[in-house]
Amino acid sequence: MPDVSVSLVNTNSRELLLACLDSLRGADAEIVVLDNASEDGSAAAVRERFPGVRVIEQRHRAGFGANHNTVISATTGRYVFVLNEDTTSDDWGFERMVAHLDANPRVAALGPRLVYPDGRPQASAWRFPSPATAALGLVTLGRAGVAQSGGRETRDVDWAMAAALLLRREALDEVGIFDEEFFIYSEETDLARRLRRAGWQTQYFPHVTVVHHESQFSAGIPERRINEMWRGRHRYWGKHHSAAGARVAALCTGAQYAARALIRARDRDFAGRMRLHARDAIGVRGPGLRELAEDWNREQGNLLAQERAFGHTSEPRRSGEP
């Protein structure tokens, strides 16, 4: 079996997923796609175009960590590459990344360099969110001291974005996989924190570059996305800091975004986003992506019940069944 198992999760991003898999052709890796109850024919398209890719076709919608946990538990590689469907690369560099991890046995997570489609670098590694980093963010208005990605050398970082993240299975076996109480956002930060406490390292690895196209799944629902992002951050603060520390972090972060909204008040779109971030940093109000998935699952359950009542059901396909 290959050393690397690729865990891809997809929700209604058929074309992005197919482009990602196209760029993975020839990679020496086990590739597993979990389709998160898509309605755009994603699973069928993957089966048709990539017969060597294993597909787990899920009938309900779950969160980022829960979905990747399903794939991690179903794969066998010594390393698991957690990957967004909205990524591509001209050179995934699995051999280089595996060689680096083999040579550095206490490194549990390796995050490659991320760039936008136009080549601009994307911040992909940061310091852990804490009262101290929140205070620094307030003083500098978010301009300094938190991002750790960048440069040409491999370096230790606090946490790296799970849009593309190579994980050592041995370390996951020790500390556990993603905490499924995080629906989406901050689950990789929490995992990196648990790894650090157990003596493992996370590193930024700029010798592999991944293009992050940023999925449009949440396009049109920016408020829900922002709500979910801050819900994850509040859970992280509450899990890893005292109640007082979590409150200080929330207030400093909210004040930072409020100040940025005031400074650029004439830019209505920007100021509006900053005010929304400020509100949610202090305390999330309103539904997020979790509720969107729950509503969809509830609606599908009601439709299935109606079909059963009228005798129009068919046996559902099991996860991974061709």
Model segments located where?
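Short, well-formed alpha-helical segments that are part of the catalytic scaffolds
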Residues: N12-G26
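A conserved acidic beta->alpha catalytic loop
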Residues: S23, D35-A44, H60, D90
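Glycine-rich, basic loop-to-helix element that forms the pyrophosphate-binding segment
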Residues: Q58-T75
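Short aromatic/hydrophobic "clamp" motif used to bind/position activated sugar donors
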Residues: V80
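Conserved donor NDP-sugar-binding/catalytic core segment of glycosyltransferases
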Residues: T88-A123
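Short, flexible, basic/aromatic active-site loop/helix in glycosyltransferases
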Residues: P129-D158
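A short, conserved alpha-helix in the catalytic core of glycosyltransferases
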Residues: D158-T209
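Non-catalytic, C-terminal membrane-associated alpha-helical segments of glycosyltransferases
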Residues: R224-G232, G238, A243-P322
